[in-house]
């Protein structure tokens, strides 16, 4: 062992929380920062990815037990599709990454790198639902999204690309849709508290913090120790 090798955590959680957290992530072997020129991106190392797989497996089982089917939609979304969801676009516009060239050829229409998938999933749900017999329809996607955050990034808290799941459903009535929302909120709460041993508070986001274009945004929130 070299004389200058640091053992344990040297930063103070109480007095320098940000640096303490970064040191924990590095020394626990959870992530590396991406190459120079890719600020805000991380490499998720095997240990952290295994944690994600366990969370994914737990949630995926809960979803499938309650009628959800997995699907996958394109990473790229035509600009015209985003424009159909103007409320969502306005909320994410500063964070959208765009592809405008393929090789040396300029694309006829710019393609957004998926910031969220409502605008690409909803048109297909409308095709798949032909009558009330097709309802409820429940689709889930495991994917990554890109949001070009201008604020300070931090591994696993706020990065420009991150892993997630997004569920999209269609229902015959508003009451059915609300019951579905509460069922999924229960499952998120179960995942935090029973799998991760993290107590959470559940509720609804205030008006200024709702998901762009949403009627209501429900949430489970954990307090940082």
Language-model segments: which ranges?
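TRNA-recognition modules of translation machinery and tRNA-sensing kinases, especially anticodon-binding
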Residues: 2-225
């Amino acid at each position: 062992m070299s004389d200058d090798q640091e053992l344990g955590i040297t930063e103070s959680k109480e007095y320098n929380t940000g640096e303490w957290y970064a040191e924990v992530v590095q020394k626990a072997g959870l992530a590396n920062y991406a190459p120079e020129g890719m600020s805000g991106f991380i490499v998720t190392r095997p240990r952290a990815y295994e944690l994600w797989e366990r969370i994914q497996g737990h949630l995926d089982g809960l979803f499938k037990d309650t009628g959800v089917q997995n699907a996958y939609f394109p990473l790229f979304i035509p600009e015209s599709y985003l424009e159909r969801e103007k409320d969502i676009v306005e909320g994410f516009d500063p964070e959208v990454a765009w592809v405008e060239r393929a090789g040396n050829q300029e694309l006829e229409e710019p393609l957004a790198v998926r910031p969220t998938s409502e605008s690409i999933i909803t048109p297909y749900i409308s095709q798949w639902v032909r009558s009330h017999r097709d309802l409820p329809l429940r689709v889930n996607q495991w994917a990554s999204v890109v949001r070009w955050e201008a604020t300070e990034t931090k591994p696993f808290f706020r990065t420009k690309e991150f892993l997630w799941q997004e569920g999209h459903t269609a229902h015959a009535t508003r009451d059915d849709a609300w019951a579905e929302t509460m069922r999924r909120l229960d499952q998120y709460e179960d995942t935090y508290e029973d799998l991760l041993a993290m107590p959470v508070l559940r509720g609804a986001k205030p008006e200024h913090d709702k998901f762009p274009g949403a009627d209501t945004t429900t949430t489970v929130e954990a307090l940082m120790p």
